[in-house]
């Protein structure tokens, strides 16, 4: 009689609601841990080049980028507080010592209104699409992460894009609900519904390829590390490492589109706020050619290190905490079976 070989432990798939809870928890943890890096970066930028009224800057909570408009000429705004910082570490310590620990999360709550729903939609759609495609194509089909990642990101960006435009408008003008309704109605009547998706195209060009590369590399790297370790299920460190490496590769590969997206959206909102006449809307490829002509090919990779510093920990924390949440619910499902 042959000895029985131990197989993988029984698992029950997590429900969509459980996936939503896991992704929401991961989103909150990611934003709490990554936001201080961007707050320090923005404070240093504001110190070296003070933001004039109407100036736009990017704020990242680790989940998504948000366009913010400097609307206050006084020094009351969190990004205009004086600090006399000598560098990143000095800024971090002085903010902590002089302003309190809460200042490291300045500006976070309003951005989470968009970021958490976007993350929940994205991760839940990815999981549901992956499960569906596996039933049709098989468990080991390598194209599944690419297809699911592309469709999930496309959907999340499309849903959130008009809401983010409205959020930015409210933040820049302090509109009442009635004025906001009038703004949306006027915009739709003048330029059609498509005007609510301004800035959508460059975001899609950056985020969709990022998502495809990220999920493809993450799933394959996670599987490879499990095989090398002789494990059926990935550990927290395997998920963390796979997320960090996959995020860094995707961040480098899509950086040119990030440079273009930042330039287009900053110009768009500066014109909106200051009522400048709208310039000729250049395509992504035209902007890229102009950047190469002005700064050389390296201009397309401006800000590589800051992007990696932000993206790598965000990807690692988000995916590892999300997978941890899924593992918790899987155990609960098995026990309650």
From Swiss-Prot:
Keyword Cell membrane tagged: no
Annotated signal sequence range: none
Membrane disposition: Multi-pass membrane protein
Highest taxon of the lineage: Eukaryota
Disruption phenotype: Cells lacking both Slc25a39 and Slc25a40 show defects in the activity and stability of proteins containing iron-sulfur clusters.
Ranges annotated as spanning the membrane: 20-40, 104-124, 146-166, 200-221, 240-260, 299-319
Catalytic activity: glutathione(in) = glutathione(out)
Protein name: Mitochondrial glutathione transporter SLC25A40
Organism, as annotated: Mus musculus
This protein's encoding gene: Slc25a40
């Amino acid at each position: 009689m042959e000895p029985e070989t131990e197989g993988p432990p029984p698992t029950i798939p997590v429900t969509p609601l459980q996936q939503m809870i896991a992704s929401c928890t991961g989103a909150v943890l990611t934003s709490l841990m990554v936001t201080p890096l961007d707050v320090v970066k923005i404070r240093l930028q504001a110190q070296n080049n003070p933001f004039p009224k109407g100036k736009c800057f990017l704020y990242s909570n680790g989940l998504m980028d948000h366009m913010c408009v400097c609307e206050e000429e006084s020094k009351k705004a969190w990004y205009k507080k004086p600090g006399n910082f000598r560098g990143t570490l000095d800024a971090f310590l002085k903010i902590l010592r002089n302003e309190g620990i809460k200042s490291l999360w300045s500006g976070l709550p309003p951005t989470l209104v968009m970021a958490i729903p976007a993350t929940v939609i994205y991760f839940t759609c990815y999981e549901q699409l992956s499960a569906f495609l596996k039933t049709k194509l098989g468990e080991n089909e390598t194209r599944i992460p690419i297809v699911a990642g592309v469709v999930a990101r496309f959907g999340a960006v499309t849903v959130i894009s008009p809401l983010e435009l409205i959020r930015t408008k409210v933040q820049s003008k302090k509109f009442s609900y009635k004025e906001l309704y009038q703004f949306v109605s006027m915009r739709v009547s003048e330029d059609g519904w498509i005007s609510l998706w301004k800035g959508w195209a460059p975001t899609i060009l950056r985020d969709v390829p990022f998502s495809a590369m990220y999920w493809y590399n993450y799933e394959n790297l996670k599987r490879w590390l499990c095989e090398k370790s002789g494990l059926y299920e990935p550990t927290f460190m395997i998920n963390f490492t796979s997320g960090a490496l996959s995020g860094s590769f995707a961040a480098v590969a899509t950086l040119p589109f990030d440079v273009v997206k930042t330039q287009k959206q900053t110009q768009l909102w500066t014109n909106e706020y200051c009522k400048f006449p709208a310039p000729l809307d250049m395509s992504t490829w035209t902007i890229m050619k102009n950047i190469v002509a002005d700064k050389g090919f390296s201009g397309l990779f401006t800000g590589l290190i800051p992007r990696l510093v932000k993206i790598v920990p965000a990807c690692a924390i988000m995916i590892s905490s999300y997978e941890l949440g899924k593992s918790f619910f899987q155990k609960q499902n098995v026990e309650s079976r």
